[in-house]
Amino acid sequence: MGEGGAAAALVAAAAAAAAAAAAVVAGQRRRRLGRRARCHGPGRAAGGKMSKPCAVEAAAAAVAATAPGPEMVERRGPGRPRTDGENVFTGQSKIYSYMSPNKCSGMRFPLQEENSVTHHEVKCQGKPLAGIYRKREEKRNAGNAVRSAMKSEEQKIKDARKGPLVPFPNQKSEAAEPPKTPPSSCDSTNAAIAKQALKKPIKGKQAPRKKAQGKTQQNRKLTDFYPVRRSSRKSKAELQSEERKRIDELIESGKEEGMKIDLIDGKGRGVIATKQFSRGDFVVEYHGDLIEITDAKKREALYAQDPSTGCYMYYFQYLSKTYCVDATRETNRLGRLINHSKCGNCQTKLHDIDGVPHLILIASRDIAAGEELLYDYGDRSKASIEAHPWLKH
């Protein structure tokens, strides 16, 4: 027989022993009560108690009554359990412990403690599972609250960017207010978590705005607060452009102002300034026929045949090519009459108009009114000096 059969036999033996002991105790109690009634009277029998030795003797008698006889032991052999569920080994100590009136007030089965212990263990195992489920539920509720709070904050930011919507006076709100429900403990915790989430700044939305504000503050200039005042003074390039346009007009129109023809001792005719010229000012154009060098040589040979004809030919180079201005023919232009001097107050300069070179005279220094206008012819050849000795000076 297995362990299950042995346990069942032990339980059955204990139950039978308990019943026999109860019967023996009841019989002894009746006999003792009758004896005391005879010895001490009825009052003592009614309120008397059984002594401890008597109870122990009764239990021992009950166990002895349930113990198998020698014939049964010899037939089964030592340690062999009965077929009717009883067992004779190591069962007496447990029976005594459970039947002792000092240790427990009532009778109970020996397996009750083991059952109760396993029951308590099952309860203890269930407590952590409940706590884990509760924590998971709280985390899920907290995450939902944070997400809802972030969505509401983003919606507020979008509405603020779009601008407030002004309702019409006759328009009624279509959405009705939802019914108010009493707040629960879970809602209160979710509300607290949502408030904490709202206190934290939203990095994805507010960071670019702060950066943009910093950029606009850095880009602030003085002109954002005060109007721009343009200077009335002209730049150097503007002045040069205006002077060039004025010279073009004077050359094309042929105007010659601020000078006159006068007779100079030892020289003949000369040009005198009638106004003051500053350094760099345009004075007059050396006007004549613009010809190339080949034509100039032919004319010069022709002019040499008549000694009364003066020399009014001026050679120069322009764009790597030699040209000549022939002012020999008599005209009313004053530039051809300005005399020579190595230390003159004017100098020649090329001025082109639409790609055509013009020879002009500008003031090399400040010229006062009444002063003769002079410039260096630049001819230092021996033949020229022999023909015109005044070129030395």
UniProtKB/Swiss-Prot annotation:
One of its GO terms (cellular component) is cytosol. Changing K162Q: Does not affect the interaction with SIRT2. Increases the number of mitotic foci formation. Does not affect methyltransferase activity. The modification Phosphoserine is found at S100. Acetylated at Lys-162; does not affect methyltransferase activity. Deacetylated at Lys-162 possibly by SIRT2; does not change methyltransferase activity. Changing K162R: Increases the interaction with SIRT2. Reduces the number of mitotic foci formation. Does not affect methyltransferase activity. Residues 72-85, 150-162 have a biased composition (Basic and acidic residues). It is found in: Nucleus; Chromosome. The modification Phosphothreonine is found at T181. GO terms for biological process: cell division; mitotic chromosome condensation; negative regulation of DNA-templated transcription; negative regulation of double-strand break repair via homologous recombination; negative regulation of transcription by RNA polymerase II; peptidyl-lysine monomethylation; regulation of DNA damage response, signal transduction by p53 class mediator; regulation of signal transduction by p53 class mediator. The modification N6-acetyllysine is found at K162. Belongs to the class V-like SAM-binding methyltransferase superfamily. Histone-lysine methyltransferase family. PR/SET subfamily. This is N-lysine methyltransferase KMT5A. It comes from Homo sapiens (Human).
